[in-house]
C-alpha cells in the first residue's frame, strides 16, 4: 500500500512552483525600457534574483502584527548615452517583498494567518454543445474559451451556415472573421474539408469584397461603434491588439487542449488564436452536425483546470511588474526633464510589489483567514476547491448540474465534503490521494495490473484517461497475487459501473479512503450512513472545540495520526539528540554539537477564540530520534487527533427532555471537567498619539470599575475581570460648545483667546459575557508613512474557562447533533446493571429516519473497547471482505467483553447490543432494553455563552424609535408572536397590553413607566398611540394608503343607553 501524501503538500508544491518557475516566467516578460530619445535603457536580468531570509520569525510576526515576507532582489542594468559617451551601471536592486508560506501552508499578513484556496475554472480550449432553440430544433455550437475567460462562439444553422458571436453579441458570418484575420476566399476554401458548404456564403448579396471591408465590419460589431468607421492601419492594429492578442489568448493549457481536440500540431509556444484553429473548429462543427463526432461534457473534470496558489501569486506578481514598469518609465522621464542622474535603484522602489500583495491577501475572495478552530480545520481549509471567485461562477447563477457529483470526481474530489446552504456543490474538498498535475488537472493514483510482472505499478491518471481502462471499484485491494480473487468484481468503465471477470481488470484503487476527503475519512463506519449525515459530520468535526482534557477515540479510522502530524499542532524533533532542558515555554535539544531551542505554543488565541497550547512530553536527559513527538498540541493525544470524549450513552426517551434532538447529560460532565474548554478573547482599543491619553484617573466612574488598572491605566496581568470593568482607561479631549461656557470661561476666551477643553471618557470596557482572567496585554505601535497618522493600539487577552451547560451544542461523528436541554444529578440518571450511571441520553428516534446507523456500530464497539481497554482502527467498506463484516466485528467484541468482565448483560443473544437499565430516581427497570454504548462525542463552537442575550433597557433607533438589532449593539426586539400566544394562554391581558404598547415603544410613556416602577405608584395610561402604530401608519403612507386614526378614551367616548 502506498504512503498517504502530506495533507499540506498541495499548498507547499504550489508555492514552490511559484518560486521556482513563476518568478522566472514573469521576470522574462519584463520589457527593456527606453525613453523616446533612446538616451536611457533599463532592463532586469531574470537569471540573477534572490530571496533574502526573513528578518523575523513566524511567532514574532504573529505577536507583533507584521507580515512574514522575504525581500526580492533582482540584478538590473542602466545604460545612459549622453554626449557620445556611454555609461553602464549594474546593480542589485530591491523590487519588493513577497509573503512567504509558513509550515502550516498559510501566509502571515499583518499578524493574521491567511490561506489561498484553489479554484476550479473552465479550462481554455474549444467545447461543442447542442441546445434546443425556441422552435425545439437542436442548434450545435462550438465555444472557444480564452485563457482569461473570454468567449468566441461558432454556431451552425439549419442551412449549415456558420456564424460567429463574440462575447454573446450579435452574430456575423465566419467569412468576416477569417477575412479579418488575413485569409482570402481562396485560402479558406482550400483549407477546409467541406468547401461546398462555405460557398453558400459567396452567393449572399452581402459578399465580403476585401480584407479591409471585413476588418471594418468585424470592428464595428466587436467594438460596438456607431456609424461607418473608416479603415486605417491604426484601426487594424487596434483590432489585432485588443481582440486577436488580448481576448483570444489561449495560454499554454488552451493551446494544448485545442491541439488535442482538433488534432492540430501547432507549436506549444504559439498561444494565440490562429486562422488555422478557426478552420479546424468549423470542420469539426460540421461533422458533429451530421453525427460524426461527440459533444463535450462541460462538467467533466478533463474540461476543468485548477487555479492553484502558484497561479494566483504569479498573476499578482505580473501585475506588480507592470506597475513597476510604469514607475520606471515615469522616473526616466523625470530624470531627463529635471536633469538628475538616475541609478537602477532610484528608478524603482518596493511599493508596487509590496502593495499589490497586500491588497491581494486582504481583498481577494480566494484569500481567506485561516480557520484555526482545531487542528483538523487548519488542514481541511487548505485543501478546499472553489467554483466561486474572479473568473468563476456565482452562487446565484450556478445550476444544479454544476453542483452535482460527476463520475470524473472519483478519487479526485470528495463526493461527501461540501458546504451546506447556497454554496452546496460549489465548495468542495480534495480527495486524500489527489494531486494537481502539470497542466492544472486533478490526478488520482491507481495500481496497474500486469500479467507479466507479479507486482503492481502505481500511476497517476488525469481525468478522462481512466475512462479507457476497466477500473476495479475497490473490492480487491490486496497486492499479494497468491490470494484467490473473486471471479466477478464490480468495475468502472466510461462512467458506467459494470460487473466483469477479474482477468479483464486493468486498474484498481490503491486505498479504501481514496475517494474521500480528510473530514469524511475520519468517520468510522461511514458506509452505513446516509450521505447527507456524513456531510454534516465532515463539517461539524471542523467546529469541534479543543478540550482541556483531550481523549483519543476508541473507534477510529487510522488517519488520526497523520491528521495531527500534518496540522502543525505537534512539536516534532527535527534532529536527534538529548533533551537538556524542558519547561512549559521551550525545550532545549543538544545534538551534533549544537543546542537547538524549540519554542512551544503557550495559550495562543485562534481566530475562533479557541485556545492553542502545547504540552511537553519529554523529560530531561532523554535521548530522542528525528521525527519523534516532543509536545502534544491542542486536541491531540498520543500523536493522534483527539477532538472529543468517549462517554457512556443510552438511546432512550427520558421525560421528553431529549425530544427533537435535545440531549440530556449528567452533572459528572460538568464537575469532572469532561467537556471543559478554554477560550481566549481579544479586546483592542486604538489610541491617537498626542490628543488622547491613557490614565487610571477617570472622572465620574465608580471606583470598583477601576480596581484592576495599574498606574498607567492598563489592566494588570492575572486580574479577574467582570462585565463592565475598565480594561484600558482613556480620555479623549473635546472642545466645549459656546453655549455651555461658564462666565469665567467666557471671560478667558474673550480676553486671552483661549479655548476651553474638557475630556470625554472613551475607555475600553469589558462587554457582556466577557468575564475571565487577563493573560496578556500588548501595546502595539503601527508605523505609517505619514507621521501624523501614527496610531497605537492596546490589546488585552482574556482567558475564559467554560464548562458544558444548557444550550451548548454537541455532536457525534455521524451527523447526530443536539442541544443540551437539562443537566441531571448523577443519582437521577439511568444506570447500568453494574451500577454505573450513563453520561448522556440520546433520542432513539433520531437514528432510523436519518439513516445514520454508523453511530450504533460505533457506540457498541466503543463500549466493548472501553471494557477491554482496546482501541480500534477500522477502514470503511469492510463488507468487501465478507457480508455483515461490521456487525460480526461488533458482536464478537461485545461477546468477548462480556466473557472477560463476567457481565452477561453486555451481550445478550436475545437483544445483542441492548441492555436493560434502571431509572435512577426510583430504581425500577425500564420496560424495554435499550442500546448503550461509548461513542465519541464532540463539543462544538456553537456555545450558549456566545449567543444568549437579553435586555431590559437600551438604545433605540432614532428614526423608528424601535430597539436596535443584534447582540453586539445590546439590542432587543418586541414581543414576538409566540410570546404573545404564551401570555394569552395565561390570560394576563393587562401585562400583554403593557408590553405591546406603552412599555415597549411609547416615547414618553416608557420613561414614566420606568420611574413609577422605581419609585412606586400607579402606572400612567398614555393618551396617544405608541410609536410602533405610528410607524405602521407611515409604512402604509409610503404605499399610497392613507390611514386616519384617533384614540378612544373615557373622556372622548360617550354612550347613550336606552332601557329596553
Curated annotation (Swiss-Prot):
It is an enzyme of class 2 (transferase). GO terms for biological process: DNA-templated transcription. Signal peptide: none annotated. It is found in: Plastid, Chloroplast. GO terms for molecular function: DNA binding; DNA-directed RNA polymerase activity; ribonucleoside binding. It catalyses: RNA(n) + a ribonucleoside 5'-triphosphate = RNA(n+1) + diphosphate. Its main location: plastid. Its EC number is 2.7.7.6. One of its GO terms (cellular component) is mitochondrion. Transmembrane segments: none annotated. It comes from the Eukaryota. Keywords: Chloroplast, DNA-directed RNA polymerase, Nucleotidyltransferase, Plastid, Transcription, Transferase. Disulfide bonds: none annotated. Coiled coil: none annotated. In plastids the minimal PEP RNA polymerase catalytic core is composed of four subunits: alpha, beta, beta', and beta''. When a (nuclear-encoded) sigma factor is associated with the core the holoenzyme is formed, which can initiate transcription. Belongs to the RNA polymerase beta chain family. DNA-dependent RNA polymerase catalyzes the transcription of DNA into RNA using the four ribonucleoside triphosphates as substrates. This is DNA-directed RNA polymerase subunit beta.
Amino acid at each position: 500500500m502506498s504512503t498517504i501524501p502530506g495533507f499540506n503538500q498541495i499548498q507547499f508544491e504550489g508555492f514552490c512552483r511559484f518560486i521556482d518557475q513563476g518568478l522566472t516566467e514573469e521576470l522574462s516578460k519584463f520589457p527593456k525600457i527606453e525613453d523616446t530619445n533612446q538616451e536611457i535603457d533599463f532592463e532586469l536580468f531574470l537569471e540573477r534574483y534572490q530571496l533574502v531570509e526573513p528578518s523575523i520569525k513566524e511567532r514574532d510576526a504573529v505577536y507583533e502584527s507584521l507580515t512574514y515576507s522575504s525581500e526580492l532582489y533582482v540584478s538590473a542594468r542602466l545604460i545612459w548615452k549622453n554626449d557620445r559617451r556611454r555609461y553602464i551601471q549594474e546593480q542589485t536592486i530591491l523590487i519588493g517583498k513577497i509573503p512567504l508560506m509558513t509550515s502550516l501552508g498559510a501566509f502571515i499578513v499583518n499578524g493574521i494567518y491567511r490561506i489561498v484556496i484553489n479554484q476550479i475554472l473552465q479550462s481554455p480550449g474549444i467545447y461543442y454543445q447542442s441546445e434546443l432553440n425556441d422552435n425545439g430544433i437542436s442548434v450545435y455550437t462550438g465555444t472557444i474559451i480564452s485563457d482569461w475567460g473570454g468567449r468566441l462562439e461558432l454556431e451552425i444553422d439549419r442551412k449549415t451556415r456558420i456564424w460567429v458571436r463574440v462575447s454573446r453579441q450579435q452574430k456575423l458570418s465566419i467569412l468576416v472573421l477569417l477575412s479579418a484575420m488575413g485569409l482570402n476566399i481562396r485560402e479558406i476554401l482550400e483549407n477546409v474539408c467541406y468547401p461546398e458548404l462555405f460557398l453558400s456564403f459567396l452567393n449572399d448579396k452581402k459578399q465580403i469584397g476585401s480584407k479591409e471591408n471585413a476588418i471594418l465590419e468585424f470592428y464595428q460589431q466587436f467594438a460596438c461603434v456607431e456609424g461607418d468607421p473608416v479603415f486605417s492601419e491604426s484601426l487594424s492594429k487596434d483590432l489585432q491588439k485588443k481582440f486577436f492578442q488580448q481576448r483570444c489568448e489561449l495560454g499554454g493549457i488552451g493551446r494544448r487542449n485545442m491541439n488535442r481536440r482538433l488534432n492540430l500540431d501547432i507549436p506549444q509556444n504559439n498561444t494565440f488564436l490562429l486562422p488555422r484553429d478557426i478552420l479546424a473548429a468549423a470542420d469539426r462543427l460540421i461533422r458533429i452536425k451530421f453525427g460524426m463526432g461527440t459533444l463535450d461534457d462541460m462538467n467533466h473534470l478533463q474540461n476543468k483546470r485548477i487555479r492553484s496558489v502558484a497561479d494566483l501569486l504569479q498573476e499578482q506578481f505580473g501585475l506588480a511588474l507592470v506597475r513597476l514598469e510604469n514607475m520606471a518609465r515615469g522616473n526616466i522621464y523625470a530624470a531627463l526633464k529635471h536633469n538628475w542622474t538616475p541609478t537602477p535603484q532610484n528608478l524603482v522602489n518596493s511599493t508596487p510589489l509590496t502593495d499589490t500583495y497586500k491588497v491581494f491577501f486582504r481583498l481577494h475572495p480566494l484569500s481567506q483567514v485561516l480557520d484555526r478552530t482545531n487542528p483538523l480545520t487548519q488542514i481541511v481549509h487548505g485543501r478546499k476547491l472553489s467554483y466561486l471567485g474572479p473568473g468563476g461562477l456565482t452562487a446565484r447563477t450556478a445550476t444544479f448540474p454544476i453542483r452535482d457529483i460527476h463520475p470524473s470526481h472519483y478519487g479526485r474530489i470528495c463526493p461527501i465534503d461540501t458546504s451546506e446552504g447556497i454554496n452546496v456543490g460549489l465548495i468542495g474538498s480534495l480527495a486524500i490521494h489527489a494531486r494537481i498535475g502539470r497542466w492544472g488537472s486533478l490526478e488520482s493514483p491507481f495500481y496497474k495490473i500486469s500479467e507479466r510482472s507479479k507486482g503492481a505499478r502505481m500511476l497517476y491518471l488525469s481525468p478522462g484517461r481512466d475512462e479507457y481502462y476497466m477500473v476495479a471499484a475497490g473490492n480487491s485491494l490486496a497486492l499479494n497475487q497468491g490470494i484467490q480473487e473473486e471471479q466477478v468484481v464490480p468495475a468502472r468503465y466510461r462512467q458506467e459501473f459494470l460487473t466483469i471477470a477479474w482477468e479483464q481488470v486493468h486498474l484498481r484503487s490503491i486505498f479504501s479512503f481514496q475517494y474521500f476527503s480528510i473530514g469524511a475519512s475520519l468517520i468510522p463506519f461511514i458506509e452505513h450512513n446516509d450521505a447527507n449525515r456524513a456531510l454534516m459530520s465532515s463539517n461539524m468535526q471542523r467546529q469541534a472545540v479543543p478540550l482541556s482534557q483531550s481523549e483519543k477515540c476508541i473507534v477510529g479510522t487510522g488517519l488520526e495520526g497523520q491528521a495531527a502530524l500534518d496540522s502543525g499542532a505537534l512539536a516534532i524533533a527535527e534532529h536527534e539528540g538529548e533533551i537538556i532542558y524542558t519547561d512549559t515555554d521551550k525545550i532545549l535539544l543538544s545534538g551534533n554539537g549544537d543546542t537547538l531551542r524549540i519554542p512551544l505554543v503557550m495559550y495562543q488565541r485562534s481566530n475562533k477564540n479557541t485556545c492553542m497550547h502545547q504540552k511537553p512530553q519529554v523529560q530531561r536527559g532523554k535521548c530522542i530520534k528525528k521525527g519523534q513527538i516532543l509536545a502534544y498540541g491542542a486536541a491531540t493525544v498520543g500523536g493522534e487527533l483527539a477532538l472529543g470524549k468517549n462517554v457512556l450513552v443510552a438511546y432512550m426517551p427520558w421525560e421528553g427532555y431529549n425530544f427533537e434532538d435535545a440531549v440530556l447529560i449528567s452533572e459528572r460532565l460538568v464537575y469532572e471537567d469532561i467537556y471543559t474548554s478554554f477560550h481566549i478573547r481579544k479586546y483592542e482599543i486604538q489610541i491617537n498619539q498626542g490628543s488622547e491619553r491613557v490614565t487610571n484617573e477617570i472622572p465620574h466612574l465608580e471606583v470598583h470599575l477601576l480596581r484592576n488598572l495599574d498606574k498607567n491605566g492598563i489592566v494588570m496581568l492575572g486580574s479577574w475581570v467582570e462585565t463592565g470593568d475598565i480594561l484600558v482607561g482613556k480620555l479623549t479631549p473635546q472642545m466645549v460648545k459656546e453655549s455651555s461656557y461658564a462666565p469665567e470661561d467666557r471671560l478667558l476666551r474673550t480676553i486671552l483667546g483661549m479655548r476651553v477643553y474638557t475630556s470625554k471618557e472613551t475607555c475600553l470596557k469589558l462587554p457582556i459575557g466577557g468575564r475571565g482572567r487577563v493573560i496578556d496585554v500588548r501595546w502595539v505601535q503601527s508605523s505609517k508613512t505619514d507621521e501624523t497618522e501614527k496610531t497605537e493600539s492596546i490589546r488585552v487577552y482574556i482567558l475564559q474557562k467554560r464548562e458544558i451547560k444548557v444550550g451548548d451544542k454537541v455532536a457525534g461523528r455521524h451527523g447526530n447533533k443536539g442541544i443540551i436541554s437539562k443537566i441531571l444529578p448523577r443519582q437521577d440518571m439511568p444506570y447500568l446493571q453494574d451500577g454505573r450511571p450513563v453520561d448522556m441520553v440520546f433520542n432513539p428516534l433520531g437514528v432510523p429516519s436519518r439513516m445514520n446507523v454508523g453511530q450504533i456500530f460505533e457506540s457498541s464497539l466503543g463500549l466493548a473497547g472501553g471494557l477491554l481497554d482496546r482501541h480500534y482502527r477500522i477502514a470503511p467498506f469492510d463488507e468487501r471482505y465478507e457480508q455483515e463484516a461490521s456487525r460480526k466485528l461488533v458482536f464478537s467484541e461485545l461477546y468477548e467483553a462480556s466473557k472477560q468482565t463476567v457481565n452477561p448483560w453486555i451481550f445478550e443473544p436475545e437483544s445483542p447490543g441492548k441492555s436493560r437499565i434502571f431509572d435512577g430516581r426510583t430504581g425500577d427497570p425500564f420496560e424495554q432494553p435499550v442500546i448503550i454504548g461509548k461513542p465519541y462525542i464532540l463539543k462544538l463552537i456553537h456555545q450558549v455563552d456566545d449567543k444568549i442575550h437579553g435586555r431590559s433597557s437600551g438604545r433605540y433607533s432614532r428614526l423608528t424609535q424601535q430597539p436596535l438589532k443584534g447582540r453586539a449593539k445590546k439590542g432587543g426586539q418586541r414581543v414576538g408572536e409566540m410570546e404573545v400566544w404564551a401570555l394569552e394562554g395565561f390570560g394576563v391581558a393587562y401585562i400583554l397590553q403593557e408590553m405591546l404598547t406603552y412599555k415597549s415603544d411609547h416615547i414618553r410613556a416608557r420613561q414614566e413607566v420606568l420611574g413609577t416602577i422605581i419609585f412606586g405608584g400607579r402606572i400612567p395610561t398614555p393618551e396617544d398611540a405608541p410609536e410602533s402604530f405610528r410607524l405602521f401608519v407611515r409604512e402604509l403612507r409610503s404605499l399610497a394608503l392613507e390611514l386616519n386614526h384617533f384614540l378612544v378614551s373615557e373622556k372622548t367616548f360617550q354612550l347613550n343607553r336606552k332601557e329596553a
